[in-house]
Amino acid sequence: MAGHRPSNHFCPLPGSGGGGPRGPMPLRVDTLTWLSTQAAPGRVMVWPAVRPGICPGPDVWRIPLGPLPHEFRGWIAPCRPRLGASEAGDWLRRPSEGALPGPYIALRSIPKLPPPEDISGILKELQQLAKELRQKRLSLGYSQADVGIAVGALFGKVLSQTTICRFEAQQLSVANMWKLRPLLKKWLKEVEAENLLGLCKMEMILQQSGKWRRASRERRIGNSLEKFFQRCPKPTPQQISHIAGCLQLQKDVVRVWFYNRSKMGSRPTNDASPREIVGTAGPPCPGAPVCFHLGLGLPVDIPHYTRLYSAGVAHSSAPATTLGLLRF
């Protein structure tokens, strides 16, 4: 019978009627046959290739493998729709009634633990924890993202800013909040105990995370400026002001970046580089109205403005040093 795969035919478990135990019922056998229950209580299916063994426990039945009222076909035991208690008593015995000769199947029923009847205490504890977390975070000056990173630095599981936000607002399910409870309680304990080693480690991680965020923002700003440059290599002062407002930069930074980028010519920039070289300011460009996208918004038409400088003239007073983008 090797090679046969179990199908979805089930057989009712004798003695497990409507009032019987519910939940998972692991079964062990002393032959290469395995009976395991599925989602529906009181149903068993035969599985192959399990080593001999008997489940310990007080609730055990021994079923003889001799002449059973079921006919095994392959690995499946088709059963009659119903089996009364009197019929089951003829071939189902308790171990206390005496050992059965020959091979047998030992069945152990493990009832499913009932859910807690009253979860009001759990809800109160989670509400109190969320309140304490928010108060302690604000008193220390940490952001929600800092708390998530600090939890990861201390306990190896980084939590997102959204997760911390929803936990404080109690917008997560009770099950998810209960899973996060140990980590957040440990973090509060570390902070309140003023563990110097743990706090130093946490501060180092937060500083490194701040550097990563700044570098990511610089890359994003550099890519946006490069897109603006491809549409208008020499923007007017009004265009520079608009770009600076969109990217939340100073106008001088944008103006210097465009002039320095024009000096680089058509050399492609490296998107992975977190910095762009900036230098002195250059003349704005004349010409017809220019249409280009500002960030993620709609295309904006910038009208033509009169030329203020002659070609090739730059501010001599502007510093010619190499600067990076401003840090935020």
UniProtKB/Swiss-Prot annotation:
SMART domains recorded: HOX, POU
UniProtKB keywords: DNA-binding, Homeobox, Nucleus, Transcription, Transcription regulation
Subcellular location: Nucleus
Region span, Disordered: 1-25
Gene3D superfamilies with a match to the protein in the record: Homeodomain-like, lambda repressor-like DNA-binding domains
Ranges where the POU-specific domain occurs: 118-192
An example Gene Ontology biological process: regulation of transcription by RNA polymerase II
A cellular component annotation (GO) from this entry: chromatin
Molecular function per GO: DNA-binding transcription factor activity, RNA polymerase II-specific; RNA polymerase II cis-regulatory region sequence-specific DNA binding
Pfam families on file: Homeodomain, Pou
Main subcellular location: nucleus
Residue ranges of the annotated DNA-binding region, renumbered to this chain: 210-269
Biological function: Transcription factor that binds preferentially to the octamer motif (5'-ATGTTAAT-3'). May exert a regulatory function in meiotic events that are required for terminal differentiation of male germ cell.
Family in the record: Belongs to the POU transcription factor family. Class-5 subfamily.
Name used for this protein in its record: POU domain, class 5, transcription factor 2
Species this chain originates from: Homo sapiens
Gene of this entry: POU5F2
